Every structure is written in C-alpha cells, then in structure tokens.
Amino acid sequence: MQNLTELHEALARVVLADRQLGDVLTEITAIARRAMPSIEAASITLIRGEKPFTAAYDGQMALDADELQYERGYGPCMDAGRAAQVFLVDDMRSDQRWPDYAQHAAAHGVLSSLSVPLPFQDATIGALNTYAGRPRVIDDHDVELANEVAAWVAIAIGNATKLGDVAAELVRTAAVPSRG
C-alpha cells in the first residue's frame, strides 16, 4: 500500500463500533506502518495534561523511542504533540534539536523518524510517530500519508469520546427516578 487511495481503503475497513479504543488505535498504527515501506515501527503518543503515553504501537523500536522521549521530557513526538508541528529527523546521528535524545535513539537503532501532530477539535492531543533504522528514508510522500493517518486517529478518538459521553448520559438518565 503506497498511495492515498489504498490507505483510505484500509483505514475505512477499520471497525470502530464495539471495540476498545486501544485496539482501534493499534490497528490504525499497523496500517500506517504498512503504508510506508521505509519505516520499521510506528506509534501513537497521546498527551493528557503534561503526561505523554504510548496509546498504541507496531514494532518495539517505536515503543523504545517513545519511552526515551518521555524519560527526557522532550523529543520529536512530544514536540509534535505540544506544538502542533511536523518533525522530521533525517539522521539522528547529526540532528541537533534534541541532542541527548537523538544520541540515545541512534544507539537503540533509530536513525530517522517522523512525528505528525494529532488534531482534535481545537487542540493537538499527541502525535503519530514513525521510526526507521536507516537515515534519510522518510520522504514527502510518507509525510502526506502520515498526515492522513493522523486525521483518522483523530476521528477514532472523537468517536470514542462521543460514545463515552453518550454512555455516561445513559447511566445518568437511568439513575434519575421516573416521575410518573
């Protein structure tokens, strides 16, 4: 799968109803990884308050790279999620934006990455992250695909949030005694 039509078809087949959000996000993350042959791992970082966490991942490299950023409090996935900007790292060995993180990521085999913000209503709630063990392999087409996946992640989270609101309202309504 290397074009937008194939990506959209794969994402449209993701079933949202009657599933846990984590399962849906894991499936979307796997689709992202397959859509971009140059990447070896993908993850979704969500940020609640100032606390980041990996909501889904496909490939241990992604989880390891995410954790390295969380330990430091900065890095491309966290900055994408906070600043609503795309961050592409062509080569961790020479990137100077996050020198401590980049050095440790390279030591763990991550040589390039892409982090795309997750838009949700009027905010950014995290990032879609992709990682590769080779430098300079993520191109503009990968950025385009990642932005599309990020939009689908936002839809899944929006649907889960709405379903949670509806369920809470049903519980609240059921708790009110009938006045008949």
Predicted segments with their positions:
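Short hydrophobic/aromatic beta-strand element in the GNAT-like acyltransferase core
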Residues: 41, 102, 115, 127
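Short hydrophobic beta-strand micro-motif common in sensory/regulatory domains
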Residues: 112-119
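Short beta-strand-to-loop transition segments that serve as allosteric relay/switch motifs
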Residues: 127-136, 141
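Allosteric cytosolic regulatory segments
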Residues: 143, 147-154
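Regulatory sensory and allosteric helical modules in signal-transduction proteins
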Residues: 55-56, 62-111
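Signal-transducing coiled-coil/dimerization helices and immediately adjacent hinge/linker segments
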Residues: 162-180
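Helix-loop-beta substructure at the N-terminus of cytosolic sensory domains
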Residues: 1-9, 13-57, 64-66, 74
